[in-house]
Amino acid sequence: MVLEVRDLVAGYGQSTVVHGVTLAVETGEVVSLLGRNGAGKTTTLRAIMGLNPPRSGRVTFKGGGISGKRPFEIARLGIGYVPDDRRIFPDLTVQENLELARRMSGRSGRWDVGRVCELFPVLTDLLGQKGSHLSGGEQKMLALGRALMQDPELLLLDEPIEGLAPLVVAHLGEALRRIREAGVTILLADQNVKFCRRIAQRAYILEKGLIQFEGTMAAVFENEALLSKYLAV
């Protein structure tokens, strides 16, 4: 078991958003965390990553507790995080963004600038461009590349295809399949169930901060009532 979350409670200020979430991700899986906007997907990922420390519950990574650790400590253990707002450095070049991610992580291994560019060939000709000059899709590729430069064993992805053109979505889907084949486990939070169906094996459905369903992606699509009630498909 690479990631286990038990009875997670988290929120912002006086507001509790996640009310006792329990989920698990096995090594080598792609697992989707599905739900509408406001369901608690982002809060769950931020709590796992230590950005919004859990109020209660337990998060373990490869059997060791990480609740209460700071985000940079969690990253150095081998968890990469790609937020929905990308969070690249706009005044640094693409190459500088990638190399800085490696230096800050304190990890080294399978991923370097060349391998990231093999995964996202469009970045090859943009290595000297500042992050602020990239399109939304290019920034998303760079954000994912930055996470990979930290040599993660687990990737947390928050709404990776939101607002992107269909061609870019297709490319990112293929990239995620290749990342999984390279041995990286993925927990993907998204509301696009059709995209998740193409790359994920299992799913959790989150609604109002509670897990409402756990099962295979095939089981999600076989249950029209489930899709209608929680995913508005």
What are these language model-derived features?
Residues 130-134, 138:
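Conserved ABC ATPase signature
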Residues 155-159:
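Catalytic Walker B motif of ABC-type/P-loop ATPase nucleotide-binding domains
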Residues 57-66, 77, 109-112, 118:
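Conserved ABC transporter NBD signature motif
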